[in-house]
Amino acid sequence: MTAIVDIIGREILDSRGNPTVEVDVVLEDGSVGRAAVPSGASTGAHEAVELRDGDKARYLGKGVLKAVEAVNGELFDALGGMDAEQQVQIDQTMIELDGTPNKGRLGANAILGVSLAVAKAAASSYDLPLYRYVGGTSARTLPVPMMNIINGGAHADNPIDFQEFMIMPVGAASFSEALRCGSEIFHTLKGELKKAGHNTNVGDEGGFAPNLPSADAALDFVMAAIGKAGYKAGEDVMIALDPASTEFFKNGKYVYEAEGRSLGPQEQAKYLADLVARYPIVSIEDGMAEDDIEGWKAITDLIGDKCQLVGDDLFVTNVTRLADGIKNGYANSILIKVNQIGTLTETLAAVEMAHKAGYTAVMSHRSGETEDSTIADLAVATNCGQIKTGSLARADRTAKYNQLLRIEQELGAQAHYAGKAALKAFR
């Protein structure tokens, strides 16, 4: 009944108008699973490879017909007839078929599309929501959203070096209340920016992209919006940052071009610690560059007991890299991006390893997204307690929030909002 009878890949567009891969998996009983693959702008050097065609005459070289061909050809040939319930075996078959350490031959975008579509087809066959199929009966925790309300760095055309300024409504009683809180702050911030003469255009992830001179200036606007919306910063709402420091780490220095200064690893750690002391910042992602292990150790020693230090480019959802961080004591959290590693099995393994080591895990989107809401289900399935999926604008972002609203309603009295417990180890 759950044997795979067809796998259909196609080229679609993501939220930036670039091609990406979408896959349908059809089972013997007629069940269909569909998954669309996201794409990042600030990508880690250690991520699995996203296969692009490189034909400049077509989509400026960004086409994904080679990946689609891999889906419809080699991957279907290898997986046709296999049981969709055998997720681990299916993912391992694709990894071995690719034969490279970074999925560079067939493409992580091809492999991931199939991996997720297989799980969704199997869930459909059992008439189960994806979060229940993957997570079992214990999957009932709704995550605290990290809502990206000011964009900078690679996600916006403005001078701010830090990539994301986010709010976390930890004090809400439910996910739906947290979403309302975030929406009210988002719209209040828009009014405050307009009043101050700033533009309110949005970046790739739906946050505002004003021309502000520094991180402090952005944080001051966020703090003002929280208060004016009727919430208490540090109690109802916490702040999270994603400097995406690899993007401005040059020749051993963190170069803040807008501010005209450069900081060494120890100075960068002290600068971030100072921000944590002055603002209710409870999470910093990629505060140090992906290969600046000295810097990661410095910041972990300095504020690791009071701030969530999330490794994104550092760990790239890879258990080998995460194991090194755990062993050597740097960072205390991992960002989970399904397309950084390329299969559902490896994604779940990274979350499990993090939790066993006492690290937190944050389920995450990419800046190039689609209307696919799989990560909302995975956040609940893994009970990770936190999700990062952009702002309160752009349908590619709100699709994930809306799916979480549906899940919360479906769970009813069983639903549990993670709230402050998601960050209990900090503050």
From Swiss-Prot:
(2R)-2-phosphoglycerate binds at residues 163, 337, 366-367, 388. Mg(2+) binds at residues 242, 285, 312. It is an enzyme of class 4 (lyase). Pathway: Carbohydrate degradation; glycolysis; pyruvate from D-glyceraldehyde 3-phosphate: step 4/5. Its main location: cytoplasm. One of its GO terms (molecular function) is phosphopyruvate hydratase activity. This is Enolase. The gene is eno.
